[in-house]
């Protein structure tokens, strides 16, 4: 019994920390992206800088630090389930993103960490045959 209580406390602390990740504004940076088809087969690979900034209320996706090449919008729903902060788990986000000439897209973003790799999968509902998988090089909590 004496060993169980400390283990439960440690488990609760990790769970609280993992949930806290979802309440923070985070900037993810990627330098490698894969373009996938609807069967998750790689169609091409890019070595460009992509940043994805996520908060509880908004998403901003930027390509090569170009303010004219970004999508941004409001988070409609978010589900966060991490067992180990930024290492093992998943966040799924439903958002409405606007780009360029006010083109609006319903989007799904999945941030996932497993086997020592973290990536972000970006799917636009009006482009079901194309997904972008961005491998996260680094992340920074903001604010």
Give a label for each model feature.
Residues 48-76:
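N-terminal glycine/threonine-rich, aromatic-flanked beta-hairpin/loop signature
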């Amino acid at each position: 019994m004496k060993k169980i209580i400390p283990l439960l406390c440690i488990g609760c602390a990790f769970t609280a920390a993992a949930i806290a990740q979802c309440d923070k504004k985070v900037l993810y940076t990627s330098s490698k992206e894969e373009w996938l088809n609807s069967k998750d087969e790689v169609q091409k690979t890019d070595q460009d800088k992509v940043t994805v900034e996520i908060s509880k209320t908004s998403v901003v996706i930027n390509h090569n630090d170009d303010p004219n090449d970004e999508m941004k919008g409001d988070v409609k729903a978010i589900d966060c389930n991490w067992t180990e902060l930024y290492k093992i788990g998943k966040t799924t986000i439903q958002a409405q993103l606007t780009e360029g000439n006010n083109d609006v897209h319903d989007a799904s973003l999945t941030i996932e960490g497993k086997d020592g790799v973290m990536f972000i999968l970006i799917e636009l509902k009006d482009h079901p045959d194309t997904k972008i998988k961005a491998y996260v090089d680094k992340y920074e909590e903001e604010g």
